Amino acid sequence: MKLPGIVTPLIAFVAYAIAQATPNYTSPLDVDIYNPSQLFNVSGPWSLMSRAGNTLYISGIRGFYPSNTTLAPVGRERVLQAFLNMKMLAELGGSDLTSCLRLQVYVTDMYRWRPLVNQVQEELWKDVAPSYPPRTILEVQRLNDDDIVEVEGTFYLGD
């Protein structure tokens, strides 16, 4: 699998961020809300992930580079970056791809982007799991900033 050249420096950046991971807020019912600004800056009134019990919920993530928040080039690289961003958040929250319970993918053109989503998912999961998590892929009219793909995931954290 060939990954963009930004991945190596990004791994060091993420390792630092993981060490710093603490919830931004914990609700009275023990739901932890995370908004790790050292990785991503959110663009509205939402958070990147939450943890309730042994389940981690990651909000819709797009294909931008965390180091400078610019979008990856349109096409395969952007789809890959969206999945890598979700993967980084899962790892930050204490999980990984092998513990993905469910994926939801939004694309603006099923015909153009679904094959790339399938290709990227096959590449990322081929060495980590014997099968793939349940996934729903939906075509939507428009995404934030006229993007082409957004990925969200639910992950198991163990007992």
Model-assigned labels for residue ranges:
Residues L3-L84, M88-G93, T98-L101, V107-D159:
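N-terminal presequence-like segments and the immediate start of the first folded domain
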